[in-house]
């Protein structure tokens, strides 16, 4: 409920220059009496001529928005806004309330009264309700139905909790170990030196570890394949497999850092400006060793990150500290609000009982206006207020009922509650004086919490753990190992409809795939892509069946078919440290983070066009990004600022979800599902979860991880189905190489475009690839590195030989052809131009390059 205090100008409230004041009749005879009566008449007559064109004037003089007339709700206290209205007829898809109000049919018996008289939730109507297939009743005394999958899932969804009764104990499978807490974990986690049960019960009564014949035992007791020893890639957490003692040589030197970076003692590179900034960024904290003292002067403010700023910058409304601590807990406004306080015009704050007491308590005597004390302005035209007029000792204030707010100090307008983030779990419908929450297809509202929960199989988290890939259920918390004996998994995604996992291995410089069945059995690993310098992030296009990845060493973003047979570098410029990547094939856009200098989050079409920057300010180390397709938002983690933030998919409406040095010391990857956000933190070696709107309800799901890097939610609703336009009318859209979704910028945008491999260009039909451009091949080779160069070298040799043969043949032909020489310079010029054009049409080594991608299919073509 909001109000507006009116003071001083009474003519605005009452419609006349005399106002509604109490007049003392002076000794001036009949003339003064006539003037007083004239003013009183003006005040009374003016009450009927106050409404604007966009308002409706009630019979009692009140003004209400014109849209409220004949809407079935009496807004004028005399009912005049609902008189002489044509009777409204409800649609067939509506439920007719007893009062005649219309509400959507789907709202009846949903546990939330939508009719003003509550008739859509009446016991007579709802007690006959029959639960649908795959639903169960919450009991004979309840009209509530919930999905079968919510039964015994650890959360009380029925009002009285009947769905969590008589559940019995969870029985672990033969391949699992039962923790003391009742949690089920993989037997391979038992006695592995890590507390996977979270209560330590999986590490009790463990015999000294022994490794197999073909294994090497690290000093930390971990076993690794013997072939991994002394291969210049540390697989033991203590690096004992690459030690001088084991290998007889010094470990391979760490990668060289650029001039704008410094090298950590643990080998990685960080920005030079992060050295000695008070915040450890290296894994071993070496960037904060041997740093000068960071003591601020007495006239300075010390930021939480250790930086010093001038004291005058604290609480000046500008974030001068990188972490914003100079603007925290600021309160520059003198509080003088509430019904018991009065703000003097001279600035003082006094008690309301001192107003109009014939004593000047304000310096300027503004608490004792002789002509305004004890005048009830609400008696005339309700003070000009559309709803509530509240008389005050001096002046009056307009107020609104719940669900409304003042739009012009007098008129109440509907509050659009849907503008508040998180007010609804998914869909928010703004109503007059309120709002209604609904869920997207595939979700159902939990009436106990208001959260839209997924219907169907239990959602789970799948995450990398360097040498294996693990899964934990979000309801029953079953914790198992999916893929084992990996080298160094750094990125992960899935094609959920096809039940396939995809991961990138940093050590093997490759991307792999494997099928996963309903029993969590993983099939044979298939290497689909090779020659990737430093894979940082991968994203699967589940509709068009392609895979996108970032390469932090080659500074590229590429795409390939899921079988790896066709690949293409989409971006190889203006990338510094490309990291996480996400795709939305429904709209044809992809998103990625880049923590280079300057750090940013970018967006582009999945075909490599329409590149744009989304986030460029207050961002330093954006590691993980994730899309919330239900709410159309992008979330990201900043490992330097220790923040979890979000923006809409156009880079607007930025919100800070969580800032925490405790839970976000070095976050790496995140994923979104329902109302929750889940992330991996590398420093804490844990998986956390929190509310995606508020950052509250923090929980720890997994502890004691080993260099975990990426995480996804595995559930069919994460990847909504859509049309593959590349297979709509022609195989592969008629493209001779890759068919890629185009960004849906407007209704005229193409649905897809074709693209060609390095060295080739699209012909005029926009479908076939032709020609050969050696410069683009060189760029592709540079992007792939030495291994890629060897793969492309035979092609270059063949092309070179073909070109040499062609020029030898053409030279022989010229020598054996009779020629005529004309001295006419005009003719000579013309024939030379014609010759150049002819060669350009038939030669494969032309200098002209056609556009890489051409429009193929649009909505208009489908009509």
Swiss-Prot record:
Disulfide bonds join 51-63, 58-76, 70-85, 90-102, 97-115, 109-126, 131-145, 138-158, 152-167, 172-184, 179-197, 191-206, 211-223, 218-236, 230-247, 257-269, 264-282, 276-291, 296-308, 303-321, 315-330, 336-349, 344-362, 356-373, 378-389, 385-398, 400-412, 418-428, 424-437, 439-452, 726-739, 735-754, 756-769. Residues 374-413, 414-453, 722-770 form the EGF-like domain. GO terms for cellular component: clathrin-coated pit; plasma membrane; very-low-density lipoprotein particle. GO terms for biological process: cholesterol metabolic process; endocytosis; lipid transport; ventral spinal cord development. LDL-receptor class B repeats lie at residues 457-498, 499-544, 545-587, 588-631, 632-674, 675-717. It is found in: Membrane; Membrane, Clathrin-coated pit. Residues 1-43 form the signal peptide. InterPro entries: 6-blade_b-propeller_TolB-like (IPR011042), EGF-like_Ca-bd_dom (IPR001881), EGF-like_dom (IPR000742), EGF-type_Asp/Asn_hydroxyl_site (IPR000152), EGF_Ca-bd_CS (IPR018097), LDL_receptor-like_sf (IPR036055), LDLR-related (IPR051221), LDLR_class-A_CS (IPR023415). It is a single-pass type I membrane protein. It comes from the Eukaryota. Glycans are attached at residues 169, 773. Residues 810-863 are cytoplasmic. Abundant in oocytes; much less in heart and skeletal muscle. Gene3D superfamilies: Laminin, Low-density Lipoprotein Receptor, TolB, C-terminal domain. Multifunctional cell surface receptor that binds VLDL and transports it into cells by endocytosis and therefore plays an important role in energy metabolism. Also binds to a wide range of other molecules including Reelin/RELN or apolipoprotein E/APOE-containing ligands as well as clusterin/CLU. In the off-state of the pathway, forms homooligomers or heterooligomers with LRP8. Upon binding to ligands, homooligomers are rearranged to higher order receptor clusters that transmit the extracellular RELN signal to intracellular signaling processes by binding to DAB1. This is Very low-density lipoprotein receptor. The gene is VLDLR.
């Amino acid at each position: 409920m909001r109000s507006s205090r009116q003071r001083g100008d009474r003519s605005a409230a009452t419609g006349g220059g005399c106002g509604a004041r109490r007049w003392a009749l002076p000794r001036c005879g009949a003339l003064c009496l006539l003037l007083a009566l004239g003013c009183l008449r003006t005040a009374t007559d003016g009450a009927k001529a106050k409404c604007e064109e966009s308002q409706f004037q009630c019979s009692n003089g009140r003004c209400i928005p014109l849209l409220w007339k004949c809407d079935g709700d009496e807004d004028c206290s005399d009912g005049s806004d609902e008189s002489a209205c044509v009777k409204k007829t409800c649609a067939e898809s509506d439920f007719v309330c007893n009062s005649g109000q219309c509400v959507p049919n789907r709202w009846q018996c949903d546990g939330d009264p939508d009719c003003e008289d509550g008739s859509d939730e009446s016991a007579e109507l709802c007690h006959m309700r029959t639960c649908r297939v795959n639903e169960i009743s919450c009991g004979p005394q309840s009209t509530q139905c919930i999905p079968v999958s919510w039964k015994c899932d650890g959360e009380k969804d029925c009002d009285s909790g009947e769905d969590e009764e008589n559940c019995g104990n969870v029985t672990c499978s033969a391949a699992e170990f039962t923790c003391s807490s009742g949690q089920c974990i993989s037997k391979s986690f038992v006695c592995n030196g890590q507390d996977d049960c979270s209560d330590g019960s999986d590490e009790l009564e463990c015999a000294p570890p022994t490794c197999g014949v073909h294994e090497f035992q690290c000093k930390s007791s971990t076993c690794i394949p013997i072939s991994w020893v002394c291969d210049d890639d540390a697989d033991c957490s203590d690096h004992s497999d690459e030690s001088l003692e084991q290998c007889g040589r010094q470990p391979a030197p760490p990668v060289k850092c650029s001039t704008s970076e410094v090298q950590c003692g643990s080998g990685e590179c960080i920005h030079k400006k992060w050295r000695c900034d008070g915040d450890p960024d290296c894994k071993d904290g070496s960037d904060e060793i041997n740093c000068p003292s960071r003591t601020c002067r007495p006239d300075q403010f010390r930021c939480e990150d250790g930086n010093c700023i001038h004291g005058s910058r604290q609480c000046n409304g500008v974030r001068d500290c990188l972490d914003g601590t100079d603007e925290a807990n600021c309160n520059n406004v003198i509080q003088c609000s509430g019904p018991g306080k009065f703000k003097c015009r001279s600035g003082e704050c006094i008690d309301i009982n001192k107003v109009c007491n014939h004593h000047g308590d304000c310096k300027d005597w503004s608490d004792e206006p002789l002509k305004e004390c004890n005048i009830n302005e609400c008696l005339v035209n309700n003070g000009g207020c559309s709803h509530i007029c509240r008389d005050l000792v001096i002046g009056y204030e307009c107020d609104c009922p719940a669900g409304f707010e003042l739009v012009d100090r007098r008129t109440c307008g509907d509050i659009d509650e849907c503008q508040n983030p998180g007010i609804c779990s998914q869909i928010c419908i703004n109503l007059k004086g309120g709002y209604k929450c609904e869920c997207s297809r595939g979700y159902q509202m939990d009436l106990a919490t208001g959260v839209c929960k997924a219907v169907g199989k239990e959602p789970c988290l799948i995450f990398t753990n360097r040498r294996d890939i693990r899964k934990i259920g979000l309801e029953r918390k079953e914790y198992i190992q999916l893929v084992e004996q990996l080298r160094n998994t750094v990125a992960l995604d899935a094609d959920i409809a096809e039940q396939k996992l995809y991961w990138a291995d940093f050590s093997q410089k490759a991307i792999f795939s494997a099928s996963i069945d309903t029993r969590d059995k993983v099939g044979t690993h298939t290497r689909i892509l090779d020659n990737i310098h430093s894979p940082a992030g991968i994203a699967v296009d589940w509709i068009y069946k392609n895979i996108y990845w970032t390469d932090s060493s080659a500074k590229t973003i590429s795409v390939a078919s899921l079988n790896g047979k066709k690949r293409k570098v989409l971006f190889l410029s203006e990338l510094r440290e490309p990291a996480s990547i996400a795709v939305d094939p429904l709209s044809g856009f992809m998103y990625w983070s880049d923590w280079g200098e300057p750090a940013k989050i970018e967006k582009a079409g999945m075909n490599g066009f329409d590149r744009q920057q989304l986030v460029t300010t207050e961002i330093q180390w954006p590691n993980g990004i994730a899309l919330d397709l239900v709410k159309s938002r992008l979330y990201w983690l900043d490992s330097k600022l220790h923040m979890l933030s979000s923006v809409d998919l156009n880079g607007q409406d930025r919100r800070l979800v969580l800032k925490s040095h405790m839970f976000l010391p070095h976050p790496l990857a995140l994923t979104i599902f329902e109302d929750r956000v889940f992330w991996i933190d590398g420093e804490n070696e844990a998986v956390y979860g929190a509310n995606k709107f508020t950052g509250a309800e923090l929980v720890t799901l997994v502890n004691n991880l080993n260099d975990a890097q990426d995480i996804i939610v595995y559930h069919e609703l994460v990847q909504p189905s859509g049309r593959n336009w590349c297979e709509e009318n022609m195989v592969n859209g008629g493209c001779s190489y890759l068919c890629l979704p185009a960004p849906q910028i407007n209704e005229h945008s193409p649905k897809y475009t074709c693209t060609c491999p390095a060295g080739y260009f699209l012909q005029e039909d926009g479908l076939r690839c032709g020609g050969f451009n050696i410069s683009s091949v060189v760029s592709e080779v540079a992007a792939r590195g030495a291994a890629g160069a060897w793969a492309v070298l035979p092609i270059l040799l063949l092309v070179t030989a073909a070109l040499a043969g062609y020029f030898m043949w053409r030279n022989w032909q010229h020598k054996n052809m009779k020629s005529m020489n004309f001295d006419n310079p005009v003719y000579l010029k013309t024939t030379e131009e014609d010759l150049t054009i002819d060669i350009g049409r038939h030669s494969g080594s032309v200098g002209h390059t056609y556009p890489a991608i051409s429009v193929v299919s649009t909505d208009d073509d489908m009509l």
